[in-house]
Structure formats: C-alpha cells, structure tokens
C-alpha cells in the first residue's frame, strides 16, 4: 500500500469538509494568516481518539449490491444509509433521484458538520501549525520535491503558502483537498447532499466533530507520515488511480471491496517498507473505518429511532464484517439493498 493509494481509500470514507480544510482555512484571513511578528502561539491539544482492540477485517462480509440501503426495525420509521464519495467531476450536478431521497427524509446526517464555527476553525488551524518548520523535518531536497509535486495540482496555492508551517499529519490531511483539473470537491456526493438539504431547509446533523477526525490523523507517527509523503512524490498519480471513482460513478459497487482490499495489500513498487505499508493499512482500516464506525453506531441508532433519516457516509464505512451494514444487523436492524442510486445527473 503506497500513499497515492491511501488518498483513494480516504476518498471512499468521505471526510467531507475536512477534505476542503486546506483550501478554506489557508486563504489570507486576519485570524488565520501566518503572523510575521513573534508572538506566543496558542497551542491546541487534540484529544486522544477512542481506541478499540484490533479486529480482523473481512472486506467481503457484505456484497455491496448498491450504494443505498434501507434501515428497518419494528416500531421505528425506515431510514436510509447512502455510501458516498467526496470527489466529483467538475460541474457535475445532483440527480433528481438523490434530491428526492433528501426530500422524503426528515433529517440529513453526514459524517461531520458542514458549518464550521469560527472558534472551531481557529482550533483546527492552531492544531495543524507546528513550531518546527517542515523543511527542517524533511530536509531541503525532499521538501522541495514535495512542493513541486503539490504545485502540479491546479488548486494547490493555498497549501503551498503555508506548507512549511504545518505538522506532517496536517500536510497529509491537506493533500486530500488537491484535485486534478477535471475533479471537484464541491461536486462530491456529501457536499451536494449538504447543499440540497440546505436548499430544502432540512434539519441536519453529524456523526462526529472535525476535531474528533483530526485526532485520528494525529496518532500517525511523524516519521511514517514523512515517508508516506516522500512516497507520494516518487510515485505520481496514474490513470489507474481513477478506477475506484469510476467504479462508484458507474454503479459498479460490488467491485469496490476487492479494489479497496487490493490497495491495502503490499505494493512492491512503493518506496515504503513492508512494515510501513502495513502501518498505513492498519491505520486506515482499524482507525479510520472500524473505530469510527463503532463510535457512530449509537448515534445512528438514536437518530433512526426518532425520524426517517438519511445517513450519508463514505462507501468504505458500509463494507466488511465491521462495516455499518453488519453492525446494524448485529444490533437488531434489517438492512436491505435498494435499487442503485445515481447521485449525479
């Protein structure tokens, strides 16, 4: 598993607004712009994420027949679980079918809030800033190569302006906002759902806070992240990196578990050692998927008991023996595939 594959995998867990943090938080802004004067910086300490014992993960426990699943339980209204992807084609628009699904739901729940209060923005920014320059941590050759690679993306300038001030984990997070010219964060499924929910004046909620998600990035060892960034630079994105997105866009959902499993396996072309690749794979599966699924389950149960709700989460959260489909079934819910939902027109 190399770090260009990691970006694809994280696209399937749909970090929503977090994927745009680098773009929206690093614009010149009096409150967030780097200060030239030497003033004491307010330190933000991220909370330790909730940890669980490592669990064997079987990608194929669920046949992903659809991206849309109905959640049913006696005495409760039906709700829906939609697997998403936060990357879309530039200028793509929401489909009438997805707009209708939002209309028939009384509440829309996404992974994180779409609205980020100013105080939270400041906390996120301060958490990302490092007192030690990234150049010093990486060395000039690797740092300059990273800058050059980031510069190849058309929306890279805000990240480049602050790159040297960020913790390595924050750089990894911010690279998730980088897009090819024909791709867009704004037309990712989650962002389209949020925009439509706002237009329809639907009550909205979330399964976790931005700070809670950042904490899972923060647990990665710094030297591992730097090695991953170097690997990402040395192995540029290729056409086959679009395979997962194309599978989702064309409704080939049953293929996604195998694609994800393959990308968590050893990759001989990577500059990362087998142990480093395994660390990244374990982090992605056990922290970014399994732990967060377990954190979310009580919230999903509580909301589903109140009203017909649309839960929109990254597709990878539906998969496997520790995915939301199986966790809900183990807790007395009937979870059935619905006809595939085309999310874009």
Regions found by a protein language model. Give the residues of each.
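Generic N-terminal leader/processing signal
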Residues: 2-5, 18, 36-37
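Hydrophobic alpha-helical membrane-insertion segments, chiefly the h-region
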Residues: 15-25
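Structured, acidic catalytic/metal-binding patches in enzyme active sites
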Residues: 40-59, 65-280, 284
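Ser/Thr/Pro/Gly-rich low-complexity linker/stalk segments immediately outside membranes or between
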Residues: 26-40
């Amino acid at each position: 598993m190399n770090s260009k594959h990691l970006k694809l995998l994280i696209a399937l867990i749909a970090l929503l607004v977090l994927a745009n943090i680098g773009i929206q938080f690093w614009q010149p802004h009096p409150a967030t712009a780097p200060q030239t004067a030497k003033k004491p910086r307010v330190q933000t300490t991220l909370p330790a994420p909730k940890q669980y014992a490592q669990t064997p993960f079987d990608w194929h426990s669920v046949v992903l027949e659809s991206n849309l699943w109905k959640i049913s339980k006696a005495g409760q209204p039906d709700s829906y679980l939609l697997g998403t992807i936060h990357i879309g084609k530039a200028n793509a628009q929401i489909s009438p079918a997805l707009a209708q699904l939002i209309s028939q739901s009384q509440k829309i729940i996404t992974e994180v809030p779409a609205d980020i209060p100013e105080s939270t923005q400041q906390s996120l920014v301060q958490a990302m800033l490092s007192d030690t320059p990234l150049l010093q941590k990486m060395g000039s050759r690797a740092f300059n190569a990273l800058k050059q690679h980031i510069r190849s993306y058309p929306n890279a300038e805000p990240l480049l302006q602050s790159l040297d001030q960020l913790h390595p984990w924050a750089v990894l997070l911010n690279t998730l906002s980088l897009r090819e010219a024909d791709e867009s964060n704004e037309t990712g499924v989650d962002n389209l759902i949020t925009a439509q929910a706002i237009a329809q004046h639907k009550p909205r909620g979330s399964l976790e806070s931005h700070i809670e998600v950042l904490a899972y990035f923060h647990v990665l060892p710094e030297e591992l992240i730097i090695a991953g960034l170097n690997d990402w630079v040395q192995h540029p994105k290729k056409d086959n990196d679009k395979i997962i997105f194309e599978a989702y866009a064309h409704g080939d959902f049953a293929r996604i578990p195998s694609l994800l499993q393959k990308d968590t396996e050893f990759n001989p072309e990577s500059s990362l050692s087998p142990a480093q690749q395994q660390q990244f794979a374990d982090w992605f599966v056990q922290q970014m998927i399994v732990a967060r699924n377990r954190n979310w389950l009580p919230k999903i149960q509580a909301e589903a008991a109140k009203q017909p709700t649309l839960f929109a989460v990254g597709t990878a959260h539906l998969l496997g023996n520790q995915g939301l489909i199986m966790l809900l079934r183990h807790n007395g819910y009937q979870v059935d595939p619905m006809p595939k939902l085309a999310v874009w027109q």
